[in-house]
């Protein structure tokens, strides 16, 4: 079953972000390694002191942005799915509360435990597993950068119940082992997870274990597909390139914890003579056009899953977390 503890804490992180308990980790092969400054040498992505500074720098910028409802204040510290989801949230917040979020309580992250993979080439990354002042879950951040001159940016932010944090495979020096995008030793290659999830949501199957974000989501869509005067259609697709590439770390059982990103659309179409009413201020803030007959909403979602080793018992991928956020809306 999917494990989805931790939702309440992350709902505080984003008013219209959908969240659950999440996990740690990441990775993917870098392409085009250049033989300069040791890019072909296998090295830790960062020293612990560097990781600590990166966490502090992100937290300072993040709290400023949340307080002011201004995405420009942490734009240099976020990327990938987090930039998409949280950036849209801040954009909506700025329109609904241009003076800022007066009720915002600064996020505090303590007891940081870093999972730092050793690899050659760029991009590089590491994971920070932290305690927060929001709840009892572990808040997990994935830091990435594309070169030695870049600032560390957070591409994933999610939460995981302490008991759900997986054990990572490490070498004798304590460095984690990254998995590649095309790792054939896993039940599903990381680069295929986004497409596999999109296919599953449309057609079902046995690629993913039952749970809230798999069988539960399909059941909910089926129930809401057609109601008196209103029909809903869904489209799902992977996001695999650049800062949205899947990332994973090997676990001690030979599987991996993998993060991946997907893109989702929901279109609501009203019957003739029926009006579409939009009450959510965040949807209104991000919406273009007038929803006279239809409303199309666009979401970005990042998932954290356990991808089992190929041939090791149950081959279904298990969800640990899903964080989704509205990024755009269009009325027609």
Swiss-Prot record:
Major location (coarse): membrane
Lipidation (S-diacylglycerol cysteine): 33
Keywords recorded for this protein, A-Z: Cell membrane, Lipoprotein, Membrane, Palmitate, Signal
Record-level GO cellular component terms: plasma membrane
Signal peptide limits: 1-32
Residue positions of covalent lipid attachment, annotated as N-palmitoyl cysteine: 33
Name of the featured protein: Uncharacterized lipoprotein SAV_5923
Native organism: Streptomyces avermitilis (strain ATCC 31267 / DSM 46492 / JCM 5070 / NBRC 14893 / NCIMB 12804 / NRRL 8165 / MA-4680)
């Amino acid at each position: 079953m999917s494990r989805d503890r931790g939702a309440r804490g992350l709902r505080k992180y984003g008013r219209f972000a959908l969240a659950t308990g999440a996990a740690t980790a990441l990775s993917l092969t870098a392409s085009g390694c250049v033989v300069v400054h040791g890019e072909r040498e296998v090295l830790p992505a960062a020293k612990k002191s560097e990781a600590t500074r990166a966490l502090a720098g992100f937290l300072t910028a993040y709290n400023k942005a949340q307080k002011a409802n201004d995405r420009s204040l942490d734009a240099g510290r976020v990327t990938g799915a987090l930039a998409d989801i949280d950036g849209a949230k801040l954009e909506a917040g700025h329109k609904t509360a241009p003076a800022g979020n007066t009720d915002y309580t600064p996020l505090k992250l303590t007891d940081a435990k870093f999972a730092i993979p050793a690899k050659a080439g760029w991009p590089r990354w590491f994971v920070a597993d932290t305690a927060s002042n929001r709840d009892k879950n572990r808040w997990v951040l994935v830091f990435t950068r594309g070169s030695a001159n870049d600032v560390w940016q957070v591409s994933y932010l999610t939460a995981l119940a302490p008991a759900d944090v997986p054990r990572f495979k490490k070498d004798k020096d304590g460095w984690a082992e990254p998995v590649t995008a095309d790792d054939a030793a896993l039940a599903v290659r990381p680069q295929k997870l986004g497409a596999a999830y999109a296919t599953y949501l449309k057609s079902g199957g046995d690629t993913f274990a039952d749970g809230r974000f798999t069988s539960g989501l399909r059941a909910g869509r089926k129930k809401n597909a057609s109601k008196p005067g209103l029909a809903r259609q869904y489209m799902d697709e992977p996001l695999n390139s650049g800062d949205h590439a899947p990332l994973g770390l090997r676990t001690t059982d030979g599987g991996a914890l993998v993060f991946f990103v997907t893109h989702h659309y929901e279109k609501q179409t009203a019957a003739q003579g029926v009006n579409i009413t939009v009450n959510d201020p965040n949807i209104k803030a991000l919406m273009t056009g007038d929803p006279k007959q239809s409303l199309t909403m666009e979401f970005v979602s990042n998932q954290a899953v356990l991808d089992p080793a190929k041939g090791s018992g149950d081959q279904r991928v298990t969800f640990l977390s899903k964080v989704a956020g509205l990024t755009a809306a269009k009325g027609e």
